[in-house]
Amino acid sequence: MRPYFTKMDDIGKPLRPAQLERMQANVAQAESIMKEIDAEVERIKNFGIPAEKVHERGEMTVWDRIAYIVDPGSFCPLHTIFDPENEESGSTGVVDGLARIAGKWCVLIGFNNKWIAGAWIAGQAENNLRVTDLAKIMNLPLVWLVNCSGVKLPEQEKVYANRRGQGTCFFRHAELEQMGIPVLAGIYGTNPAGGGYQGISPTILLAHKGANIAVGGGGIVSGMSPKGYFDEESAEELIAATRHFKAVPPGSVKIHYDSTGFFTAVFEKETEVLDALKGYMADMPAYNPRFFRVAPPAEPKYAPMEIASIVPVNPKAGYDFDNVLARLVDNSEHMEFRPGYGPEVYTGLVKVDGFLMGVIGNRHGLLPNYPEYTNEYIGVGGKLYRQGLIKMNEFVTQCGRDRVPIVWFQDTSGI
């Protein structure tokens, strides 16, 4: 397979000086939009308790933990500004993405302990399910950094369990484990109620010495009372016993390591929990990426920064998709699938970092004498016609057969 894809056909062409000059305003507008996105990412990162106060408590922020555990330069954040329920923080209370830990790829997610101690907040369930779906689809270990104070009670109706609610996340953990996909968790801080469920459902639980997980409330605590119910007198007795150290606080490390066995191991330092997660990830079976490379990695022949001079910010304006692709793929080479058939759609194979990848993209512009089944109008790029749909179906089927990943550059107004 390697020689077959070592050298492919060239794609793209240099930009003319006139086009670069004409698109200067577009470049400035695109850069302005990117700065707005970067500013929002930074705002979310700084939202909540200042990192300094978290550090004063002897704790790391979720950002600190991620920076410590991932291989340098490997973290690819996802869903950072995803906020489907317009939560006041502008996020879903978790930080997630793809990452390499101890040389092995995984899906990584952690509760943002700078905001309401990592509470379940509106929109978080959908984010969590997207993350677990990703682990399922890509067959990658799921690594949790758990520091969750449970549901944000004033908005608890927004996190009720349903098919896309928080309860489904725990079902997904069981589903992943049944599929042989490990779910690893580092446990920090106090994790009551839903935070406790989050803590007990992974495969391996590694806890910091100050960690606590408990699922409870008056109805649960009453089961510990000889009366069979929980009242003010029982509460006072429990408080007095706790003050005099006559009872081990439920959910503590002493309970879940010594008695229930939920915790696989307990560590003195926060970084030791992360080191232990690294150790488990190092033991994960995985192919070396070079096994799948069809050619040595190579830079595009044309500068990726020129894309802003090709793709207009105005969504109604057209552009040359082939020129965009040429600035993203190795050596600006491709192997087009069925060129000339279904011209409104590009389908082909390319290399990215030496790996083979399928590409589907919508081409723009007028298409004379097309579609072939009518003379009443001419085809317009960005729409989908019969030939293009047939070509996409064939291409996706063959990529699926050969397990070649596909990226779709979707820019279509429909059929």
Label each PLM-derived region with a short phrase.
Residues P50-K53, N139, G195, R403:
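Alpha-helical hydrophobic/aromatic positions enriched in membrane-embedded helices and signal peptides
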Residues G123-N127, R164, G194, I200, ...:
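Charged, alpha-helix-enriched surfaces in structured cytosolic catalytic cores
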Residues M1-C106, G110-A117, R243-H244, S252-F262, ...:
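Intrinsically disordered, low-complexity segments enriched in small/flexible residues
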Residues R2, K7-L20, Q24-V27, V146-P289, ...:
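Conserved catalytic cores of soluble enzyme domains
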Residues G97-E177, L184-G186, G348-K351, F355-I415:
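Cleft-lining beta-strand/loop regions that shape enzyme active-site pockets
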Residues N46-I49, A135, T168-F170, N191, ...:
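Generic hydrophobic alpha-helical membrane-segment signal
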